[in-house]
Amino acid sequence: MSISLNTCILILKEHHLLKSSAVQDTVATKMDYVSYDSRDIQTNTLFFCKGAGFRPTYLSMAKDNGAICYVAEQPYPEGKGMHALIVRDVSKAMALLSAAFFRFPQDDLYVVAFTGTKGKTTSAYFLKGMLDQANGGKTALISSVNDVVGPKPEDSFKSSLTTPESLDLFRDMRTAVDNGMTHLVMEVSSQAYKKNRVFGLTYDLGFFLNISPDHIGPNEHPNFADYLHCKLQLMVNSRKCIINAETVHFDEIYAAATTTTNPDSIYLFARENFENPNLKVPIDFRFASQELDMKETRFKLYCASDKAKKLPINGDYTLKMLGDFNESNGTAAIIGAGLAGLNHDQCAKGIRDVTIPGRMQTERTKSHGMVVVDYAHNKASMMALMSFMQNEFDNPKIIVVVGAPGDKGVSRRPGFSESLTAYADKAFLTTDDPGFEDPKSIAEEIDSGIDHSKCDVTIELDRKKAIHDAIAMAGPDDVVLICGKGADAFQKIRGVNTPYPSDIVVAQNVINELEGQKEHFRK
């Protein structure tokens, strides 16, 4: 693959991004590689100078290693002798030029995207399971857990960002197309729009699942209004929109969708008993719980409106994943599958056995109650998880192991305090990706907001010991919730991904120590 200097200039001019250019007569004008990392350079590379941490020395390194053109928001002396494209916004420029370099792979994929404060990963996996059932496993995935760009084991790898940098995203999409993938299901975070990682990308289907305050802090969104604004961009950039009618800020979400999408291509869903007298548009799909237990989740989907009845997806569904909150995620995914051309039988078969590493993985122990490992990592997901457990187990003692990440998501900390006060009997506050912050200070900040008359707190920064002590103290009728990291096999500490066995492995080892060796946790 390659891109010419002239093509780059034309694209940047077309989008009113080019401020100036400097063309070197003696330098090649065809770029055969693209990169924003000075350590990843090949001969004739187009190099992007991006990010708050960019230093001019990185451009010098890139030039020495073979870069012949750079894109930046200001000229750099270190780029002397290189082609220079000076732009108004380098993140937008990188998205546009990367798409062109990788030959617009989105044009060869049916692209579906989910946004929401919670439920994105689960919904994405549900939809991938159904599409794979219909297309023979030709569904690519970009999620906060794993990225899948082909059918082979080596085509699946741990993701580093919920939504990758635009260059990586378009490269992965091109790889997926070359590997025979026909569909792409992806999570789109608010940061993806704030940082222009998906700039210029239009989705065949866009889902808005829910919203509540999250990712608000110095290094993320300055306030909730900015967070909501970034989330809304998915609606503006989708050909068909699917919205949870129960979410707060529904009017703003629906209005954003109608700016670019005909109301006939906007679909709403909600629980069977949900009523909103202020809702001015009909709800297209309803779902109702059939049966909840600690083995399966069963619910029924109803096609309510005339346009909904055109999709042959009405009927009963069973999920291997537990939690009544997953009925909403499942409903969204089934609607997406219906819009992609699937029928009820294909959907029911494809969604039934979907599991996700680190999501609602459970183990009923002999003497220490029910142990649950889940990725719940904000107030909304914590409240949903603990509420479900309280109802399912008839008001059990709830013991929670949780921590908050450092350097981001500062707004989550009071949310943890509120949710633990509301539902937990005992909390072990521990370490969870502290970054450059002091994990003890983070734990103390959460602890300061907890009502200790309702929830007893222990601060134990050794996460493995916190998990051990939580399970060891649990009685046979108690519930232990290990929240936040799921299947993550590292802790982010001072800029380093420090190896960590994962909550699942730690919990398995603790149960083995307490009760004897056996295979644990339903997959």
Where are these regions (language model features)?
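N-terminal leader/targeting and accessory segments in enzymes
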Residues: 1-96, 100, 318, 322, ...
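Phosphate-binding loop of NTP-binding sites
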Residues: 92-245, 249-264, 393, 515-521
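Acidic, Mg2+-coordinating active-site environments of NTP-dependent enzymes
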Residues: 78-79, 205-371, 447-451, 456
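Short, polar loop motifs at secondary-structure junctions
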Residues: 68-78, 143-146, 246-248, 270-274, ...
